[in-house]
Amino acid sequence: MSLTEARFHELIDDLQQNVEDVFEDSDLDVDLENSAGVLSVRFENGSQLILSRQEPLRQLWLAARSGGFHFDYDEAGGRWICDASGDSLGELLARVTLEQIGEELEFPEL
């Protein structure tokens, strides 16, 4: 069953808020900007992560220094799963954050 447009936007809105909460609750110096469905996380070292919704595809895309990742929502598991690696969004966010700034963060809700 494919996601309805309303459900897709609800999931992305919740996800982006969860990501913002993790960074805001950390001791990291980050700039967060959420505009037009795109969440940008800018780190003190100048690197960034960009989470964007791809409405026509019902996908979430993550751009990081190490590359671009596309995620589909798994209704059964309640998680966004990378279509290339099978990793959850939370696993990939933890990995790319460590790679980009050398800090370990957990994204348990993702």
UniProtKB/Swiss-Prot annotation:
GO terms for cellular component: cytosol. Pfam families: Frataxin_Cyay. Involved in iron-sulfur (Fe-S) cluster assembly. May act as a regulator of Fe-S biogenesis. This is Iron-sulfur cluster assembly protein CyaY. SUPFAM superfamilies: Frataxin/Nqo15-like (SSF55387). GO terms for biological process: iron-sulfur cluster assembly. The lineage of its organism: Bacteria, Pseudomonadati, Pseudomonadota, Gammaproteobacteria, Pseudomonadales. Keywords: Iron, Metal-binding. Belongs to the frataxin family. GO terms for molecular function: ferric iron binding; ferrous iron binding. It comes from the Bacteria. PANTHER family: FRATAXIN, FRATAXIN, MITOCHONDRIAL. InterPro entries: CyaY, Frataxin/CyaY, Frataxin/CyaY_sf, Frataxin_CS. The keyword Metal-binding applies.
